Curated annotation (Swiss-Prot):
Keywords: Oxidoreductase. This is Peptide methionine sulfoxide reductase MsrA. The keyword Oxidoreductase applies. It comes from the Bacteria. GO terms for molecular function: L-methionine:thioredoxin-disulfide S-oxidoreductase activity; peptide-methionine (S)-S-oxide reductase activity. The active site is at residue 10. Its EC number is 1.8.4.11. GO terms for biological process: protein modification process. It is an enzyme of class 1 (oxidoreductase).
Amino acid sequence: MKNIVLGGGCFWCVEAVFERLKGVIDTEVGYSGGNPNPSYESVCNGDGNIEVVKINYDEKQISLLEILTLFFKIHDPTSIDKQGGDIGIQYRSIIFYENEEDKILAQNFIEEQQKIFSKKIVTKISRLQTYYKAENYHQHYFINNPNQGYCQAVIAPKLQKIQSG
């Protein structure tokens, strides 16, 4: 089993996509990259943390390359601290890696993707230093709240787009 931690906008959206993938064992939403012991309120007030999803996966069933490819399909890696209507540093595009092999793979992936994108990719790559699990009510938010307004307006269409190819 391996882990990768990704930030690409609202963590509810990112988690909703990855928790459905074959080979993904578990997902957990949290915060990384800012002040210690964050809360949702402190993150929204700009404490420097990023909304992230920790993805625990079986590399025999799904590769990191496949995960990163999907990650770039579900968010805009050329947008600085903004995804759709969600604006702020907590929504930045970032890949937090745990080992050098994953760092190199992520760097090579972004280099290849830059050949496809007309705008500059701004996704950061950084070693995971600290990770804080988000509050329980954020975990598996779409599964637990499929009829909530944000879920219907933002997450459900994103899932439909991914499922339709």
